[in-house]
Amino acid sequence: MMTGTLGTLVPIILMFAVLYFLLIRPQQKQQKAVRQMQEELKKGDSVVTIGGLHGTVDSIDESKVVIKTGDNTRLTFDRRAIREVSAAE
């Protein structure tokens, strides 16, 4: 009787393990990389926001970033709104 129960649980456990390694773990790694990138922002970095705005970091505090665009307009965003960073130019 115990063998039958164990035999039905093994495939379910294997499915959860595969699901974890194919879906959940890569997403966690990506979120960690994005979080690290946002924490390492510095003045002068060229950035792209999640809305597609391109600009240069003008100033930073703990939760907000001021971005200067091509026409010297300054816009304030949450740090979480930064999608990509390229090195300071």
From Swiss-Prot:
Q: How does it assemble?
A: Part of the SecDF-YidC-YajC translocase complex. The SecDF-YidC-YajC translocase forms a supercomplex with SecYEG, called the holo-translocon (HTL).
- Please report the organism this UniProt entry assigns to the protein: Bacillus subtilis (strain 168)
The name under which this protein is listed is Sec translocon accessory complex subunit YrbF
In which domain of life is the source organism classified? Bacteria
Where do the TM regions start and end? 4-24
Cite a single GO BP annotation: protein transport
Quote the subcellular location field of this record. Answer: Cell membrane
Q: Name one GO cellular component term.
A: plasma membrane
Locate the coiled-coil region(s) and give their ranges.
none
User: What's the family?
Assistant: Belongs to the YajC family.
Q: Does the keyword Ribonucleoprotein apply?
A: no
What the protein does comes down to:
The SecYEG-SecDF-YajC-YidC holo-translocon (HTL) protein secretase/insertase is a supercomplex required for protein secretion, insertion of proteins into membranes, and assembly of membrane protein complexes. While the SecYEG complex is essential for assembly of a number of proteins and complexes, the SecDF-YajC-YidC subcomplex facilitates these functions.
